[in-house]
Amino acid sequence: MRVLRHKAFARLVAAYLVSQAGSKVHRVALLVLVYLLTENALWVSLVLGTQLLGTVVFSPLLSAWADTQDRKRLLVWSDLLRAPLVALIPLLGAQSLPALLLLVFLMELLRDLHDPIQNAVVPDLVPEEEVDEANGLILLADRISEVLFVGAAGVLVAWVGPAYAFYLDALTYLASGLLLAGLPPLKPQALPKAGYLERVKEGLGHLFRQPAVRRTVGTLFAAAAFGSVERSEEHTSELQSLMRISYAVFCLKK
C-alpha cells in the first residue's frame, strides 16, 4: 500500500472505486429494467450483444485515437459524459427500447475509451520501480469491487428500484470525473509519425499476423458471444429471483 502515498495515484484509485461502484449498480439495474419492460430474455440478450459490439468493433479505433490526445481530458470527460447518459436511461430508455439500446451503446463506447487510458496512465503517476505494485493494486481493487459492489448493487436495486439506482449511478460518474480532474497533466508522451488509420491497421495487422494472438482473441470472442446468449437465458430465472427479493424488501420497508 506504499504506492498510495503518491497523491495522484491515490486519486486515480479513489475515482476507480467510485466509478466501479456505479458501474455495478448500472449493470444490475439495466438488466432488471429490461426484464421489467419486456419480460423477454431476447431483449436481455440484445442489450448484452450491444455492449459486446461496442467493445469488439470500436475499442481498437478509440484506442488508436486516444493515444494522440490529452489523456487526462479524456478520462474526465468520458466519466462526466456518462453521468447524463445513464440518467437518461430511466427517462428515455424506459419509453423506447431502441433508445435504450442506443444509450447502452454510447455508454459502452465511453467505457471502452476510459478504461484503457486509466490503466495506461499508471506509469505516469508512480515511480518506475512501483509500477508493478500500482498495477497490482488496481487489479485488487477490481476484484474487490466485483465481490462487494455487485451484491450491494442487487440489494440497492431491490430497495429503491432500477430508476433511482440509475440516478445514483450518474452521481458516481460525476464524482469520479471530478476526482480525475485533480490529476496532473497527462499529455501524450510522443505523437506517432504514422497516421490514425495506419495505426489502426497496424494494430489489427498484428492480431491477424500472430496465430497465437489470433486464436486467443477468437476464443475469447466466441466465449463472450455464446456466454451472452447463455446468460440471457439464465437471466430470466435470476431476474425473477431478484423480483422476489424486491418484493420481500418492499414488505420489510412497510
Where are these regions (language model features)?
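Alpha-helical transmembrane-bundle signature of multi-pass membrane transport and export proteins
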Residues: 1-238, 244-246
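Hydrophobic alpha-helical segments, chiefly the membrane-spanning helices
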Residues: 239, 247-254
